[in-house]
Every structure is written in structure tokens, then in C-alpha cells.
From Swiss-Prot:
Organism of derivation: Geotalea daltonii (strain DSM 22248 / JCM 15807 / FRC-32) (Geobacter daltonii)
Its EC number(s): 2.3.1.274
Gene symbol of the encoding locus: plsX
Gene Ontology CC: cytoplasm
InterPro entries per the UniProt record, alphabetical: FA_synthesis (IPR003664), Phospholipid_synth_PlsX-like (IPR012281)
The protein, known as: Phosphate acyltransferase
Length: 346
């Protein structure tokens, strides 16, 4: 299997993309195609020992910047690195795409080139969060600002399959993010989504609150992209703030410094758990292919791990499992939806 890497996406392209790709090829034996300006990419490759590594370069003359509109990736910049990367998957020249570029453009290009898997109205961006019990998958974290109840049900099904297939969770528990655990809480979106999810074959646990994401009460949390993105950015900011405040406190006293030295291994383990680079990127679920969206400021380690997860996603045939799960549950939640419509009309 081969992973196409958008070598021109991200704040530090193509340097970190090339470095991460070389590391992934060397450590995991993954075949990689770097998509971007051939001259610039080859210049970066020359800095590394790539002997015996299966790394090729595909030229793309255009780049979709962070401030470009998502439609530019599809309509205007037809030779952009992100679009060409997805074209490689479409033409069976690659099996997955990794990009640290414009997330909206990545999602738009993936949908335009590869389309959606059967049974999905809107793809979603998912993100793994570290918890007290392991990991929790949250989706959508930015793909769809406005959602309908059916979207959240489909997100839950995709998340359940991803958690089972890629995260190795035996029986994923599902929750809807709300402002309280009581069924009376929430809004129209969460209440109707909850009713529909109860009719599915999923192990649905009901509402969960923001704090429950990190205590590991459930394995998959679904919400609309507006709320999910706020959760994501808040978590990133909190992790950075806690780290900075802790460093400042340690500097205040020699005793604190000695304590830090004695506890250094614990601090290292903690940092590893909350470090987003360990997870690489956020899978784009729902497109008829594999896409991994990385943070714009990703370093080489994040790119390397994103390539690893993208390869794993493609290797396990997760999308086919999603289609099967969607087909299994479609008549169940659609029947419940018709019941809700009849009740509203009556």
C-alpha cells in the first residue's frame, strides 16, 4: 500500500513533510509518494539518506494556502498538491492521503475527487483525545458547522467502526455531547439525535458532558462541527497553558526543580499522552477513500504518525466495514425518524 503526502501543505512545508515521510518509510516500511513542487521536494529529500526507501515524487504546480477558500482546491487550483494527492487515490496509484494543509480544502478535495461512501450525507473530521482510561474519538471537530440529527447518527456509526477497527476497542460505547446527562437537557439536535441512536444496534450510552470526554466514559463522542471545533481548540489551548504554567512554577524554587528532576519520567509520560503528534492527524471519515488531516503546525513526528495511521486505516478496509454498518442500521433509524415525523404532524 502507498500513502500520498501533500508535501506543500502546512506551515513548514515541504521540510517537515519530507522528513516525516522519510521517517515513516524507514521505521514502518511504508511506500510513499510526495506530491508537490518537484524541485523543492527533491531538494529536501537530498538532505536525508533515502537509499532503499520506496519514496517517489509527483509534481504539482499549485498550492492551496491556509487563507484560500475550500473551493479553490476543487475549482480553481486543479493542479494543487492536495487535489493531485486525492487523484492518485482515485486512479489507484495510492491508497491514502495525508495533508497538513488547509483542512477545509482537504475535505472539499476529498469529497470532490473521491465522493462519499454509500449511506453518508456528510463526511466528518474525527480526533482522538487522551483520557484517564485510554482514548476517546470525537467527531465532528470542524467539518460541518450545522448538522441535522441524521448526520450525528451517521457520525456515530462511522466513529464506532473506526474505534473498533483502528483503535482496537472491542465494543465501543457511544455518547452525544450535551450540556448535561439528563434526557431533558440539550437542544433539538441532540434530543432527536439521541432518540434515533437508541433505535440503532450501537451501544449508545446517552448524553455525555464535556468533562466526560477525558474521563473515558465512552469511546466515541458525537457532536456538530461547531461544538466539536470549540472542544478541540479549547483542549489544545488548555494543554499549552498548563504546560507553560507548570514550567513557570518549577522555576520559582530550587526545591521545585529538584522535585521535577525526581519526577521527570512521570512528566515525560504525561507529555506523551497529551501530545497531539503521537496521534498524527485527524481522520476524514465518510469519503470513499482515506484522508488524514494534520495540524498546520505539525512537525515531522506528527507527519510520520499520520502516515502510519493512514496506512493502517487503508490496510484494514475500514470504509467497507462502515458501509456494512450503515446498511445494517439504516432501516432502524429511518423507521424511528418516520415515527418522529408522524408524532410531530399529529
Amino acid at each position: 500500500m502507498r500513502v500520498a503526502v501533500d508535501a506543500m501543505g502546512g506551515d513548514n512545508a515541504p521540510g517537515v513533510e519530507v522528513e516525516g515521510a522519510v521517517a515513516a518509510a524507514r521505521e514502518f516500511g511504508i511506500a510513499i509518494t510526495l506530491v508537490g513542487d518537484t524541485e523543492k521536494v527533491n531538494c529536501e529529500l537530498a538532505k536525508h539518506n533515502c537509499k532503499d526507501l520506496d519514496i517517489t515524487v509527483k509534481h504539482a504546480s499549485e498550492v492551496v494556502g491556509m487563507h484560500d477558500s475550500a473551493s479553490d482546491a476543487v475549482r480553481k487550483k486543479k493542479d494543487s498538491s492536495i487535489r493531485i494527492a486525492f487523484e492518485l487515490v482515485k486512479n489507484n496509484e495510492a491508497d491514502a492521503v495525508v495533508s497538513a494543509g488547509n483542512s477545509g480544502a482537504t475535505m472539499a478535495a476529498g469529497m470532490f475527487v473521491l465522493k462519499r461512501i454509500k449511506g453518508i450525507d456528510r463526511p466528518a473530521i474525527a480526533q482522538i483525545f487522551p483520557t484517564l482510561r485510554g482514548k476517546t474519538l470525537v467527531l465532528d471537530v470542524g467539518g460541518n458547522v450545522d448538522c441535522k440529527p441524521l448526520n450525528l447518527v451517521q457520525f456515530a456509526i462511522m466513529g464506532e467502526v473506526y474505534a473498533r477497527s483502528v483503535m482496537d476497542v472491542e465494543n465501543p460505547k457511544i455518547g452525544v455531547l450535551s450540556n448535561g446527562e439528563e434526557e431533558s437537557k440539550g437542544n433539538d439536535l441532540t434530543r432527536e439525535s439521541s432518540t434515533l441512536l437508541k433505535s440503532t444496534s450501537l451501544d449508545y450510552m446517552g448524553y455525555v458532558e464535556g468533562r466526560d470526554i477525558f474521563n473515558g466514559m465512552v469511546d466515541v463522542v458525537v457532536c456538530d462541527g461547531f461544538v466539536g471545533n470549540v472542544v478541540l481548540k479549547l483542549s489544545e489551548g488548555l494543554a499549552e497553558a498548563v504546560s507553560t504554567m507548570l514550567k513557570e512554577e518549577i522555576k520559582q524554587s530550587l526545591l521545585y526543580k529538584i522535585g521535577y528532576i525526581l519526577s521527570r519520567r512521570a512528566f515525560i509520560n504525561f507529555k506523551k499522552k497529551v501530545d497531539y503528534t503521537e496521534y498524527g492527524g485527524a481522520p476524514l471519515l465518510g469519503i470513499d477513500g482515506v484522508g488524514m488531516i494534520c495540524h498546520g503546525g505539525s512537525n515531522a513526528k506528527a507527519i510520520k504518525n499520520a502516515i502510519r495511521f493512514a496506512h493502517e486505516y487503508a490496510r484494514k478496509g475500514v470504509n467497507q466495514h462502515m458501509v456494512e454498518k450503515l446498511q445494517e442500521n439504516y432501516p432502524l433509524y429511518m423507521q424511528q425518524l418516520e415515527t418522529l415525523k408522524a408524532q410531530a404532524a399529529g
